[in-house]
Amino acid sequence: MQRHSNQRLAHLVFSRACITVLLLAFALLIPAACAQTYDLSTLPAYPADADKPQIHGVIRIHGTELTQHLIHLWEDGFLKQHPLVRFGDYMLPSGFSGLTAGTADINVMGHTAWRSDLTAFEGAFGYDPFEVMFATGGFNLRKGNTPAAIIFVNRDNPLTGLTIKQLDGIFGAERSGGWIGTRWSTASARPASENIRTWGQLGLTGEWKDQPIHLYGIDATLSNWSELIQRVVFKGGDKWNPAMNEIVRGGVEVPADAQIVSSVATDKYGIGFNLMRVVEKNPGVKPLAIAANPDGPYVVPSSRSCYDRSYPLVNAVYLYINRKPGTPIEPTLKQFLIYTLSREGQQAVVEDGMFIPLNPEADARELQKLQ
């Protein structure tokens, strides 16, 4: 559905006002301790009137239902600064094609772009789309999305943590290489001898030593977590341990996430990946700390370790534009991107409640990319 900001209809304004009132009313029910989790005071404020350029034009944004509310918050805040700018929005289940077809200026994704999207774009233009991380994925937010991948085991398992290399050995398989964007690299190849299939290979002794590791996870063919694990753990590879019990989302009796967690809770030798707000509800399992390097440190998954991005399996959400390498970003578009990364833009991320705002270091890196 297209929304033209230069023709704000009365019923749309009324609807937004009603939604705002309802959100404010709900916020009153939330304990004060949860009202403000992140300190945004060190993020750069959007420039004052005297310091920002006077711009106008139309920005066409493609997004999804998951990002629609956040996009509207950004637009409303930006229009207060630049009233001559207009927006055209299209909210689609999969909207990356708009960037490739030239019908969108910005694509706001609830995840990183799939390789098929990148391949199509590169085929059309000969270079990769320009990527900006605008928030960190959720952790255990009430309506959070794109959450970190939590690795968990049965509560009786003596393990407390695993390294990324060990996770590769457990969940992965022999591979000849991996994808870096749309390019295949043999740098991430590994032999079958690095597979980890028993608990004894992780140093467990006694009754655990010769027991096989039972894997549980979401269908590895297409999911946000699967993509994250392939990118971070498998170094771009896409070969999984064929023994994994893949549970497909869409079941009518028990949600797949709950099935995965309950399976590990009843399987002493099980291990799985899922989101924290499901894992923490089941006392039969425990999350593991994860280390990016063999010598540590091991980082416990938490809201704080996701915010500072020290947890190795933290997720993120991105927006994309068509920027030819070595060329400047169109001024109106650049100002909107700056706004999304400003203190005001990141406050909108907090208000939206889907994602975690960027920490100052991550925010500064993304702003630098716009120069």
Spans of model-derived segments:
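Hydrophobic alpha-helical segments, principally membrane-spanning helices and signal/leader peptides
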Residues: S15-R16, T327
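Bacterial N-terminal signal peptides
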Residues: R16-P31
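Flexible loop/hinge segments at secondary-structure junctions
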Residues: A35-Q371
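Intrinsically disordered, low-complexity repeat segments enriched in small/polar residues
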Residues: L9, L22-L23, A33, G88
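N-terminal secretory signal peptides that target proteins for export/translocation
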Residues: M1-F14
